[in-house]
């Protein structure tokens, strides 16, 4: 007998008693993971879902999990929650304020269950614009959220006149080569007060690194090919399309796009989700220069005009 199931369409309720007139305890969303607790009464069964226990009619459950992609209304900026078919959580950007934090608290019924913990397979900061990373502050501060990994694009803002680091000339262009690829490299930079200064983004990463709730913090790049755990052997594939790095005299670098703003946006983490016949492209905050660059990179044509 199966011990797990998923909420059916569109949004059934967990009830206090095995009756359609029973008090509603918690509404489920289509595809929500539930645990069957084993008690039955006619066509009613006991379950646990969204951190609540109670009764639900068996016909309101289904055996197949969905790929769930939530694009959250967070005001300015972007934020998305992905729930994979194997019931793993992936968070991509979080807006500028606490909208994503409040959505997650509602989505997983955390306010009523302050001791509950939610583990994310990944949190991805596509790039270091505040309207994409600002909302992570409350999330990284909360003991209710745990992360297998936090990913970013390798560009970490720092104090001083060179926001993204020194520009290195090569091949008639300029590149940023001072990239932060792993946790030791991040910790080394965060230990320098002159690096952090009053910049919000490195302070956010410092909060995450010192929280003890993130097992890994590292960069992503196109040569990684896939988000760890979702390669071409997985039912859900998550391809990493960008940022695309170049060799700069033996050092890995990201191309400079006119100014710091265009450069950090243009090197957003870009993901392509592939699930059966569904394709979803998550493009961060790409600009025209970056789009032409990526078109040229992947097509082999001269698209930079």
Question: What do the PLM-derived regions correspond to, one by one?
Answer:
Residues 79-82, 104-109:
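N-terminal cofactor/phosphate-binding cores enriched in small/glycine residues
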Residues 126-132:
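Acidic, metal-coordinating catalytic cores used for nucleic-acid/nucleotide bond scission
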Residues 30-34, 38-41, 47-50, 62-66, ...:
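Flexible, acidic/histidine-containing loops and adjacent segments that form or flank the divalent-metal
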Residues 73, 82, 92-93, 127, ...:
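Divalent metal-coordination and catalytic microenvironments
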Residues 65-88, 96:
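An acidic-aromatic substrate-binding cleft motif
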